[in-house]
Swiss-Prot record:
The lineage of its organism: Bacteria, Pseudomonadati, Pseudomonadota, Gammaproteobacteria, Alteromonadales. It holds the Pfam family MoCF_biosynth. This is CinA-like protein. It comes from the Bacteria. It comes from Shewanella sp. (strain W3-18-1). Belongs to the CinA family. SUPFAM superfamilies: CinA-like, Molybdenum cofactor biosynthesis proteins. CDD domains: cinA (cd00885). HAMAP family: CinA_B (MF_00226_B).
Amino acid sequence: MKLEMICTGEEVLSGQIVDTNAAWFASTMMEHGIEIQRRVTVGDRLEDLIAVFQERSLHADVILVNGGLGPTSDDMSAEAMAKAKGESLVENIEWRQQLEDWFTRNNREMPVSNLKQAMLPESAVMVDNPVGTACGFRVKLNRAWLFFTPGVPFELKHMVKEQFIPFIRDEFNLDAKVALKKLLTIGQGESALADKIEPLELPEGITIGYRSSMPHIEIKIFARGEKAIVLLPRVTGHVKMVLGTAVVAEDKATLAEEIHSRLLNSGLTLSVAESCTGGMITSQLVDFAGSSSYLHHGLVTYSNESKVRVLGVNPATLDDHGAVSIPTVEEMAKGARAILDSDFALATSGIAGPDGGTEDKPVGTVAIALATRNGVYSQMIKLPRRSRDLVRSLSAAVAYDMLRRELLAEAVIVDYQSIGRFSK
């Protein structure tokens, strides 16, 4: 099966928004052992949409079309598909009724413009969208099925998981015997990871891929076929062994997700005091439902005054060592933990740049501390020649990893190949 994707929208084509839908769709398909062969982005011009539908339908077996199903004048996907096939738009009575029901349930009057969303190409097969007003549909043109989906990410994901994937599996008799293991790493570059993994002899049916999503690099181990699936745990173990401390999570998208899963329902509590990371550590945890069960508070103590008055940092410590120092960040962590007697507290203070560095403490210098009931762990890392955003995200990741290792009763401070560390 040859799968392609057509992304629509002037804002996507012009770069006004980042096309996260395409990235999510490609990643999701890959997890099911299906690779996208081509992706095309086209603006909101009727003639361009017609042309790309006609041209790509000669080459693909199935095409996921994303966007252009709304009620406004620049939503042209249904009209373009009808013209590409040489047929009329007709009202889908079933979807019109669903639209009217949707607005009634939400105590709203349906605008006349929304009736456009019930107008589908004459040969279209309706694809249900229980979470929105944009009607999905599919049409056969030349050799391809074109499967039309909403541009709203939540609606797209719902439709792909519940409608698109089952459809292509049935239509093309795809073998569902695919398994995937993901290993999340930090502190080593993609080439360094590959140098360690490539010498491994992989059994037939198992392949390895890499995805950089800083501050992490994700290792994907695919197993296709029953024999390969049986061997997947063993291969995963070998990969983890050669990568050592670089592996920080399995089947998690971020270290924040790993920390959340370990603290949730654990009875343990966490507080956070952040300077250079500016609430990033706390924010990433709050993204997950249930984080209130373990997260006591997150404090952004950016100024020296706030470090003193909120966290109880000794003014003499700041005078003698500066805000970016091991003594200061240790006192920040202790102070954050003491406020509500949390089990753990993380603290960061650093120079994210692009300015503010000195010869002794250049841009990219970050002090990180973990306070526990039994003591404090701390380190000052070096992240030179990184952007401000990357300095902050790498610092948050190292802080998470310190906590993760403490939760696993492992050495809290470890060496990362691509992250330097000052001696205390």
